[in-house]
Swiss-Prot record:
Keywords assigned by UniProt, alphabetized: Acetylation, Cell cycle, Cytoplasm, Nucleus, Phosphoprotein
Region (Interaction with RPLP0): 2-187, 235-355
Native source species: Rattus norvegicus
Name this polypeptide is given: Cyclin-D1-binding protein 1
UniProt gene name: Ccndbp1
A Pfam family this chain is assigned to: GCIP_C
Length: 355
């Protein structure tokens, strides 16, 4: 009599299952970055969306905690236990992504980017947690595991902090831009104050001029690449004024959006944020270009790029609903100030262009 045996499905070892899950989660990231909304605006329910997204995020956080705890206990989890928790983590992560896909673009590109970035942080954070569990010795929870688990929890908790409309999202992004440009402006001012190579030397004893011309050049910079020449210092003045104008422009734009921005004007708010986002990187490029050794042609190029972005940002703001008074003079004044700075920079860098 032939005996029948029930086939037993083969399960990979626990660590191999974790490695496979980490790969699966990372394969989802490109899909999230380019994914389109799956619902029309008519089907979108704002309150239901935020509730669903937050609940899905909290589920991922809970599963991440269970996963970390399971691999911190003795004995180590069986292949069956590992399969079960891996499936739960995968399902929870897919639910977060599915919730994101229900957020339509016409609710605001700025807000949608914030939601997308939050989801990416959750998915990537979970994959990093799996990496940490794979790297740690079996049955020996390391600080890295706990940190990774906490990072997942923090990413999940941040979902509740996401602005709930595009105006609030725009203000958040503009505030970040203002802060970044403020930091760059203060850094540049501090560099100008502290990088005078002759500070405290020429003023100490004018009569003892020979002390500044000894054989070793004691007290004087020996490398001209480490300090500003007189020509550099003259060029820095309009560059600093241009950075100052950038900071003032962003602050003014943020104030206008805060005071006059309308939640239903999502496209105009997105346009303002998009162009304003370009200001900080352009400021950074200019600030970096004025550090010694200074290439005057590079300063001219980075200045022109910043001026182009600034004027475009001011013009887009002026043409939008956040500027209810066409006769408001501050935008033309800022544009004139920016143009004046650029004219001066062109004048001071003309020799570099002609070489």
């Amino acid at each position: 009599m032939a005996s029948s045996t029930t086939p037993v499905s083969f399960l990979a070892p626990p660590l191999e299952q974790l490695r496979h899950l980490a790969e699966e989660l990372r394969s989802l990231l490109p899909r999230v970055r380019v994914g389109e909304a799956q619902e029309t605006a008519e089907e979108f329910n704002r309150e239901m969306f935020w509730r669903r997204l937050n609940e899905a995020a909290m589920k991922v956080s809970g599963e991440a905690t269970v996963l970390t705890t399971l691999f911190s206990k003795i004995p180590s989890p069986s292949p069956q236990e590992t399969q079960r928790i891996c499936e739960q983590v995968h399902i929870a992560t897919e639910e977060v992504i599915a919730a994101y896909y229900t957020f339509p673009k016409d609710q605001g590109i700025t807000l949608r980017k914030l939601v997308r970035n939050a989801v990416l942080d959750i998915v990537d954070g979970t994959a990093q947690l799996l990496d940490a569990l794979l790297a740690a010795p079996s049955q020996s929870p390391e600080n890295g595991d706990l940190i990774s688990c906490n990072s997942v929890s923090v990413a999940c908790q941040q979902v509740a902090e996401i602005p709930k409309d595009n105006k609030a999202a725009a203000l958040l992004m503009l505030t970040k831009s203002v802060d970044l440009v403020k930091d760059a402006h203060e850094e540049m001012e501090q560099a100008v104050e502290e990088c005078d190579p002759y500070c405290g030397l020429l003023d100490d004893s004018e009569d003892n001029s020979d002390s500044h011309h000894n054989e070793d050049g004691v007290g004087l910079p020996s490398n001209r690449d480490s300090y500003w020449s007189e020509e550099d210092q003259a060029l820095i003045t309009p560059c600093l004024a241009l950075v100052r104008a950038s900071r003032a422009s962003l602050k003014k734009i943020r104030i206008l959006v805060a005071e006059n921005g309308r939640k239903d004007q999502v496209a105009q708010l997105d346009d303002i944020v998009d162009i304003s986002d370009e200001i900080s990187p352009s400021v950074d490029d200019l600030v970096l270009s004025v550090y010694p050794p200074v290439c005057h042609l590079t300063v001219r190029i980075t200045s022109a790029k910043l001026v182009s972005v600034l004027i475009k940002a001011l013009e887009i703001t002026k043409a939008s609903h956040v500027s209810p008074q066409p006769g408001d003079s501050w935008i033309p004044l800022l544009i004139n100030a920016v143009d004046h700075c650029m004219d001066r920079i062109k004048e001071l860098t003309q020799r570099a262009v002609e070489l």
